[in-house]
A protein has these predicted regions:
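A generic signature of intrinsically disordered, low-complexity regions enriched in glycine/proline
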Residues: 8, 16, 100, 161, ...
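Low-complexity, intrinsically disordered extramembrane tails and loops of integral membrane proteins
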Residues: 1-44, 262-264
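Intrinsically disordered, low-complexity segments enriched in small/polar residues
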Residues: 4, 220, 251-254
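Selective recognition of hydrophobic, aromatic-rich stretches within alpha-helical transmembrane segments
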Residues: 18-29, 72-107, 132-138, 145, ...
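A broad, structure-centric signal for solvent-exposed, well-ordered loop/edge residues
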Residues: 13, 151, 201-202
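Interfacial aromatic "cap" segments that immediately flank transmembrane helices
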Residues: 36-66, 103-133, 165-173, 182-234, ...
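Membrane-interfacial helix-loop-helix connectors in multipass membrane proteins
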Residues: 144-167
Length: 264
């Protein structure tokens, strides 16, 4: 295996499943873990970051540079979201390699481009369409009900109109949030299930949704810890995000291993 950190991923990355005794028994829809595990995912993510902190930061900077280059080029910028998702999934593959004792490399950013990229792109499209549908469901009823108010502003008290608009905006936000949560739950583990377990898009999203739903309490604690870490990361001129973003990626992987595997 080449030790050059800039070398493209070799065959060891393409063979992403690589079952071993360390994996434990895979549970297709996941299993319930203790509530405190939500905090432990961050601790285990920190261990993965500590295994190669310099390479994590270098890879993250390379991610931002590549994404920016794609985003500013006309026509190609349409695909920026797909490129970002594929590179992010590549970093999840890198987490798996780190877990197994292999080095993290900048080349991991391109690992998912060779590992079922078609399914991953479909996953992004499906998630995007579901998000648009959720927005339409949230906006349309209130948007239609607001038309008489907007066209009859001269006949309505300004304070009453403002209050009605604010209430409508709040309700739209809450409805969209309620509809978005299951969408993101369905997406959360789907990339890993696609590249690591060879799942189809629909099956991966359904299993991810079930796994997140049955572990709502651990995820609640996970989110609270993440909120605290985000606040801390903002203090030193946002430089803490150079550590926090890799930890977020790694925490998705550690949660995946915790929920979908039972150690023998």
């Amino acid at each position: 295996m080449s030790q050059n950190p800039y070398a493209p991923p070799g065959a060891d990355i393409e063979d992403v499943r690589r079952p071993s005794d360390e994996d434990g028994r895979f549970i297709e829809s996941g299993h319930v873990v203790a509530a405190g595990r939500g905090a432990s995912w961050w601790g285990e993510a920190w261990s993965l970051f500590k295994a190669a902190p310099g390479m994590w930061i270098l890879t993250l900077l390379a991610f931002f540079v590549l994404y920016a280059l794609v985003a500013i080029i006309p026509v190609l910028n349409f695909f920026a979201g797909f490129v970002a998702m594929l590179m992010g999934t590549g970093l999840l593959i890198g987490c798996d390699d780190l877990h197994r004792g292999d080095p993290l490399r900048v080349g991991h950013l391109f690992a998912a481009f060779k590992t079922r990229p078609g399914r991953l792109i479909v996953l992004v499209v499906v998630t995007g369409l579901l998000s648009i549908l959720a927005m339409l469901v949230a906006v349309l009823p209130f948007g239609l009900s607001m038309l008489p108010i907007l066209f009859g502003m001269e006949d309505m008290d300004t304070s009453l109109m403002t209050g009605t608009l604010l209430v409508s905006i709040l309700l739209i936000f809450l409805i969209f949030l309620a509809l978005s949560i299951p969408i993101y739950m369905a997406y959360w583990f789907a990339p890993l299930l696609i590249v690591k377990q060879d799942f189809g898009v629909g099956k991966a999203m359904l299993c991810s949704l079930k796994a997140c739903a049955m572990n709502f309490v651990p995820f609640l604690l996970y989110g609270l810890v993440g909120l605290v870490l985000t606040i801390v990361a903002m203090i030193p001129l946002f430089l803490g995000f150079l550590i926090l973003i890799p930890m977020i990626i790694a925490s998705i992987y550690t949660a995946y291993r915790d929920i979908f595997f039972i150690q023998r």
